[in-house]
């Protein structure tokens, strides 16, 4: 029996490129033995609802074509269910942090080749209160950049749009009093921002978590304590090289469970989208989602070789 694949795509991502190449994508998957259909989202939440429906119809593979927000919605549609289908990713967004982390090609046909080759690996996801995320959760004014950056600017200059908006916001940044409990430890004090990372790539910074593992069951917790503008600029420069972890104003820890609260009204960023406000409880769900990935990722330090799946190793 042929395997069934359902593509869930954002037709506006990537300058509408996927929408134009959809017929070729369907033909390519059909030739590879997949009975394939597609669904175009129209508004926020559509991808989650369609992923849930596809689960009920017992699709073998779900393919998310869009940015990190589309991928997040698809994950939220399947995360709570047993017997989850394998997940394919076609990166079509501005930054594509998750795709970068798994070395998935940015071109559509290359990403489809990864799915067709059939190698997959199980990765951690995060649960924040009652929703899920696959790449990061963060708080602080600077973390609002990804969902406050104008779409027109993103379409013109791509990932650099975030840096432009970020530097514009730097002078406005204020520290807030936070209480962060993580695996029996507590941080109580003023901080500019915090990150909970599941991969090595966040907002295009591919070395923000230089020792990231995608399947170890731990978040990487980064807290940037109250700093002046010069110190923060220095931290950002170091972060581009993966050298920020030893800065005296940076707390860098690993944790499975994290609780964050504040008396200040603080917005959250979840996989690049608005994620509500504090307080929030975070839990790492180890190796929860099975994702198609290039076979050579097994040689990367991102994957715990003790957990390597048989289908990620060449026969």
UniProtKB/Swiss-Prot annotation:
EC primary class: transferase
GO cellular component: plasma membrane
Annotated GO MF terms: ATP binding; ATP-dependent diacylglycerol kinase activity; metal ion binding
Binding site for Mg(2+): 213, 216, 218
EC number: 2.7.1.107
Pfam families registered for this protein in UniProt: DAGK_cat (PF00781), YegS_C (PF19279)
Metal-binding among keywords: yes
Record's cofactor remark: Binds 1 Mg(2+) ion per subunit. This ion appears to have a structural role and is required for catalytic activity.
Reaction equation(s) it catalyzes: a 1,2-diacyl-sn-glycerol + ATP = a 1,2-diacyl-sn-glycero-3-phosphate + ADP + H(+)
Active site: 273
UniProt keyword annotations, A-Z: ATP-binding, Kinase, Lipid biosynthesis, Lipid metabolism, Magnesium, Metal-binding, Nucleotide-binding, Phospholipid biosynthesis, Phospholipid metabolism, Transferase
Example GO BP: phospholipid biosynthetic process
Domain spans labelled DAGKc: 1-132
Keyword Manganese: no
Binding residues annotated for ATP, in chain numbering: 10-14, 41, 67-73, 94
Needed cofactors: Mg(2+)
Annotated PANTHER family: LIPID KINASE YEGS, SPHINGOSINE KINASE
Family: Belongs to the diacylglycerol/lipid kinase family.
Subunit structure: Homodimer.
General function of this protein: Catalyzes the phosphorylation of diacylglycerol (DAG) into phosphatidic acid. Is a key enzyme involved in the production of lipoteichoic acid by reintroducing DAG formed from the breakdown of membrane phospholipids into the phosphatidylglycerol biosynthetic pathway.
Protein name as it appears in the record: Diacylglycerol kinase
């Amino acid at each position: 029996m042929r395997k069934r694949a359902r593509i869930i795509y954002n037709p506006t991502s990537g300058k509408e490129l996927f929408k134009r190449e959809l017929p070729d994508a369907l033909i390519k998957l059909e030739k590879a033995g997949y009975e394939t259909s597609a669904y175009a989202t129209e508004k926020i939440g559509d991808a989650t609802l369609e992923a849930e429906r596809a689960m009920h119809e017992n699709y073998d593979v779900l393919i998310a074509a869009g940015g990190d927000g589309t991928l997040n919605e698809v994950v939220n549609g399947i995360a709570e269910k047993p017997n989850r289908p394998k997940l394919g990713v076609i990166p079509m967004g501005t930054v594509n942090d998750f795709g970068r982390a798994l070395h998935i090609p940015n071109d559509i046909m290359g990403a489809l080749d990864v799915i067709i080759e059939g190698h997959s690996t199980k990765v951690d996801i995060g649960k924040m209160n009652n929703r899920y995320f696959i790449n990061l959760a963060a708080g602080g004014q600077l973390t609002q950049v990804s969902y406050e950056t104008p779409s027109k600017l993103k379409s013109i200059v791509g990932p650099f749009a975030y840096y432009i908006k970020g530097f514009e916001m730097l002078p406005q940044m204020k520290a807030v009093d936070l209480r962060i409990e993580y695996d029996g430890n507590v941080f109580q004090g003023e901080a500019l921002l915090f990150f909970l990372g599941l991969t090595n790539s966040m907002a295009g910074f591919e070395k923000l978590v230089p020792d990231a593992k995608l399947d170890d069951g731990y978040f990487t917790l980064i807290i940037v304590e109250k700093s002046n503008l010069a110190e923060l600029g220095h931290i950002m420069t170091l972060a581009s090289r993966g050298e920020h972890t030893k800065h005296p104003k940076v707390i860098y820890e690993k944790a499975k469970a994290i609780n964050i609260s504040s008396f200040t009204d603080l917005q959250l960023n979840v996989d690049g989208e608005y994620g509500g406000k504090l307080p929030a409880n975070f839990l790492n769900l180890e190796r929860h989602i099975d994702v198609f990935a290039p076979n050579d990722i097994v040689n990367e330090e991102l994957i715990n070789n003790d957990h390597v799946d048989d289908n990620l190793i060449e026969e």
